[in-house]
Amino acid sequence: MFVSVGITASLTTILAAPVLTWVWANHLEPNLLRVTRLNWNLPKKFAHLHGLRIVQISDLHLNHSTPDAFLKKVSRKISSLSPDILVFTGDFVCRAKVETPERLKHFLCSLHAPLGCFACLGNHDYATYVSRDIHGKINTISAMNSRPLKRAFTSVYQSLFASSRNEFADTLNPQIPNPHLVSILRNTPFQLLHNQSATLSDTINIVGLGDFFAKQFDPKKAFTDYNPTLPGIILSHNPDTIHHLQDYPGDVVFSGHSHGPQISLPWPKFANTITNKLSGLENPELARGLFSFPEESRLLYVNRGLGGWKRIRFCSPPEICLMRCLYEP
């Protein structure tokens, strides 16, 4: 009898585990918004930034499946953090489609920061969607090949078995920013910085770079108006670009793109290595979190993002990052 009960319990657990995991990953964790709190310990020359609060969001991927309740939750949480500067590091939409323009505008207009809201574009934010193809090359992805299920299998195959080197397809040309998205941004608090710099009241530089996959990453142009006597924040959607910025100024780089990745196994180590490859990065170790580059006196923060082409997450909840600037004599 006891053996029978034990077997029944074991079978129930075996059958229930995948169902519960599916429910968690599809319906619960995608709505578990988390705030990551970081401190930027300032050198004396940047002491004037003491107390400044910078909030970063990324990878909203707004589409018809994004719940209004989630957007309101994000907006309320950002407001509660009282940011002085708010930055958005790209991928406003999914696969170059502005599916719900009024919802996007309403959400962005609900966000405010006294020193300004700034944004760069991600690889989904151009007139044509650009990502890795089945061969691992960076290329435009047609509407047929960007269908969710097909794209998911392609991404998994490419991430695990194809090259992750940042190689462009021979036919890929620089892509233009999505005109519909750009038009919407003009009517929101966000200033789009596309290979441009802005200086805030002789306090800090904000640099926004074009997306690397879209062949619009142009740091030489972006830093033209950079004030080298002031600290700098750099917005670059793809964290792989950190190694292309070694010859340029700037103290903190904010990125996204990887989503964490959305399905992440933090342990054991080999499982974490495999799931990090799902980020599609050339440097998968940069899939999430804070990184320090002492030789350049630079920090990189890679945000897990808010959404995705599919709202599924496991051990990688959606994220808002708050960075506080602190100077201690």
From Swiss-Prot:
It comes from Chlamydia trachomatis serovar D (strain ATCC VR-885 / DSM 19411 / UW-3/Cx). One of its GO terms (cellular component) is plasma membrane. NCBIfam families: lipid_A_LpxG. Binds 2 divalent metal cations. Signal peptide: none annotated. Its EC number is 3.6.1.-. This is UDP-2,3-diacylglucosamine pyrophosphatase LpxG. It catalyses: UDP-2,3-diacyl-alpha-D-glucosamine + H2O = 2,3-diacyl-alpha-D-glucosaminyl 1-phosphate + UMP + 2 H(+). It is found in: Cell inner membrane. Hydrolyzes the pyrophosphate bond of UDP-2,3-diacylglucosamine to form 2,3-diacylglucosamine 1-phosphate (lipid X) and UMP by catalyzing the attack of water at the alpha-P atom. Involved in the biosynthesis of lipid A, a phosphorylated glycolipid that anchors the lipooligosaccharide (LOS) to the outer membrane of the cell. Can functionally complement lpxH deficiency in E.coli. Overexpression of LpxG results in toxic accumulation of lipid X and profoundly reduces the infectivity of C.trachomatis.
